[in-house]
């Protein structure tokens, strides 16, 4: 079944970031997710508070490297800064490395990757693809790797607690995808393929999970009432 941008998923199978998705990923996400690039800009602006000379920044689930690459371009004039993307899909890292040859991309799951002491760790629409029973362990690992004064930025799609509001947001999301060229069949196919793969939480559930992992200072930034950025120090 087709989900748009020449991405085809076999009937009855779940969504995967492998199997040729990397070649079409950039176009697909920009046409699928409202304010995708604006979210990158917001993360980069926030990074100014944490990236200094000799800093280390990770992006978890770095895909084709656009966000970690943009962050690096913003701070590359600083002394010996390091920006590392962690992505378990080899094809994604191949695309990322071809665009940003000066950066390091590690092909590994976050669970298996070794995190060095770091000033900033970014998760941009990544944690929602991790099974819920594994998230606390990953968040604890992130917390333990941050240096004093460091930060974790979590950018996630969340479920609204009010069913009426949730319905409005879902409806607007579908309209956004239609306006960007996706057919109703492609939208439905993508939605069905994501069942059991992308598992979203409410805002309260995410905050509680983060606090359980050790984060004590949790703040939220709302982006035009569409995206939620959870900002942790």
Give each language-model segment a name:
Residues 122:
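A conserved beta-strand element that flanks and buttresses the S-adenosyl-L-methionine
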Residues 149-157:
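Conserved beta-strand signature within the Rossmann-like core of class I S-adenosyl-L-methionine
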Residues 58, 63-112:
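Class I SAM-dependent methyltransferase SAM/SAH-binding core
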Residues 213-233:
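Core SAM-dependent methyltransferase catalytic element
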Residues 37-53:
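Conserved alpha-helix/loop element of class I SAM-dependent methyltransferases that forms part
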Residues 158-209:
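C-terminal alpha-helical "lid/dimerization" subdomain adjacent to the S-adenosyl-L-methionine
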Residues 1-24:
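N-terminal, positively charged/glycine-rich alpha-helical extensions of SAM-dependent methyltransferases
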Residues 136-148:
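A short glycine-rich, Lys/Arg-flanked "PGG" loop and its adjoining helix->strand segment in the class I
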């Amino acid at each position: 079944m087709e989900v748009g941008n020449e991405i085809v998923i076999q009937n009855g199978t779940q969504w995967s970031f492998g199997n040729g998705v990397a070649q079409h990923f950039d176009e697909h996400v920009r046409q699928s997710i409202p304010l995708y690039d604006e979210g990158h800009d917001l993360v980069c602006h926030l990074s100014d508070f944490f990236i200094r000379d000799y800093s280390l920044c990770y992006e978890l689930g770095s895909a084709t490297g656009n966000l970690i690459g943009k962050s690096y371009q913003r701070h590359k004039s600083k002394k010996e800064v390091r920006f590392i993307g962690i992505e378990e899909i080899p094809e994604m890292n191949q695309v990322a490395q071809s665009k940003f040859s000066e950066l390091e991309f590690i092909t590994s799951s976050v669970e298996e990757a070794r995190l060095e002491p770091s000033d900033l760790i970014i998760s941009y629409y990544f944690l929602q693809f991790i099974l819920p029973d594994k998230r606390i362990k990953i968040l604890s690992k992130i917390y333990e790797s941050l240096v004093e004064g460091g930060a974790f930025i979590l950018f996630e799609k969340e479920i609204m607690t009010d069913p009426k509001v949730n319905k409005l947001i879902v409806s607007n999301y579908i309209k956004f995808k239609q306006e960007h060229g996706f057919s109703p069949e492609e939208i439905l196919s993508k939605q069905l393929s994501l069942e059991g793969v992308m598992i979203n939480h409410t805002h309260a559930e995410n905050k509680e999970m983060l606090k359980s992992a050790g984060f004590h200072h949790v703040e939220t930034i709302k982006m035009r009432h569409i995206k939620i950025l959870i900002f942790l120090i």
